Regions:
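Non-heme Fe(II)/2-oxoglutarate
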Residues: 1-78
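Catalytic core of non-heme Fe(II) oxygenases with the double-stranded beta-helix
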Residues: 77-166
Length: 166
């Protein structure tokens, strides 16, 4: 993709706190957790929350999603929409295999829901970039950039993909 980028953005609290509260409330519903093979190792991941009733009916969560989308649209000056959003919680020793999303979306994001001293998100670019998880920080990047997450003790993130309207 032309003009590839990686941005580290700090969002206002209580956005991450409210999103984390929703995750803690709904992660115990077995219908929200996917069993499909993903790049997530030693962790749990939701199906697309845009399609899950618990999250669709939660007004606070929907307001948070709208806030994230509006922030990104304003930052990029583009008309965008969500194509997917997932929660991922990494357990002790959890990590994310290197991958990209070029086949699915134009832009990707990782919103950190807690602060960790490990579990950096890394990007396979020159020079290499590695970002430690800090609550309220969101990494926004071009979807074709290879990325992964290093081993962690316990990390919670909201990840998503966005497309431009044609």
């Amino acid at each position: 993709m032309k003009n590839d980028f990686i941005m580290n953005i700090t969002l206002d609290d209580p956005l991450a706190t409210n999103i984390l509260s929703c995750w803690e409330k709904y992660k115990h519903n077995k219908f929200n957790i996917t069993k499909v093979e993903t790049c997530t190792n030693n962790g749990i991941q939701t199906s697309n929350v845009l399609e899950l009733l618990d999250f669709k009916q939660d007004n606070i969560f929907q307001e948070c999603l709208n806030n994230i989308l509006q922030n990104i649209k304003n930052l990029l000056g583009l008309n965008l929409y969500y194509c997917w959003v997932h929660f991922v919680e990494y357990l002790e020793g959890g990590y994310q295999d290197i991958h990209n999303h070029k086949q699915n979306e134009d832009y990707s994001f990782v919103l950190y829901l807690n602060t960790c001293s490990d579990g950096e998100t890394y990007f396979n670019v020159e020079p290499p970039i590695s970002i430690l998880p800090n609550k309220n920080n969101m990494i926004l990047f071009s979807s074709n950039i290879d990325h992964g997450a290093k081993t962690c003790y316990n990390k919670k993130v909201l990840v998503g993909g966005l497309r431009r309207y044609s």
